[in-house]
Amino acid sequence: MKYELTATEARVIGCLLEKQVTTPEQYPLSVNGVVTACNQKTNREPVMNLTEQEVQEQLDNLVKRHFLRTVSGFGNRVTKYEQRFCNSEFGDLKLSAAEVALVTTLLLRGAQTPGELRSRASRMHEFSDMAEVESTLERLASREDGPYVVRLAREPGKRESRYMHLFCGDVDELSLQTSAPESASGDLQSRVEALESEVAELKQRLDSLLAHLGE
């Protein structure tokens, strides 16, 4: 597979994929928009505190690698960025809406169970049931041009196995296990996090609207 992203590159691409679906009126994103999305405290694991300079360096690298492209339309003085990571006109990686939702959530939060993914990806795609989540994960894991995700060994005491994306290379399961947050009520936590993300995005939309009205 030709994808070998750093953790920060994965965060940038994940943010652009997410905002393309959840806040299309604000997409493509400016550098400031990408910084805000990367450092968002909801629906991010781990939470990052990237500077504008750090994000700009990642954007420049990803443009050179043809994973992003710059957009500067007529009358638009601010350079904006859109993803060419998947489903672009000349790109090779074609994903369904369900696959985009799962890949994005894995890029933004790392290894997760199917139950967590269903809840956290719901703003991008409404999965009808757990079977749809699991079948989508299996397709991503068995694609001829992939695999793009891998099923991890089930941890002791856990009911579900977690899945991880492979866009940053092979997975070190030991480090993932030691860094995995402990939660006795993971499904409830996932639903709360999804609601927090919706509130954060509504606030972001309101701030953007107020700023636009004040111009």
Swiss-Prot record:
Transmembrane segments: none annotated. SUPFAM superfamilies: Winged helix' DNA-binding domain. It comes from the Bacteria. Disulfide bonds: none annotated. InterPro entries: DUF480, WH-like_DNA-bd_sf, WH_DNA-bd_sf. Belongs to the UPF0502 family. This is UPF0502 protein YceH.
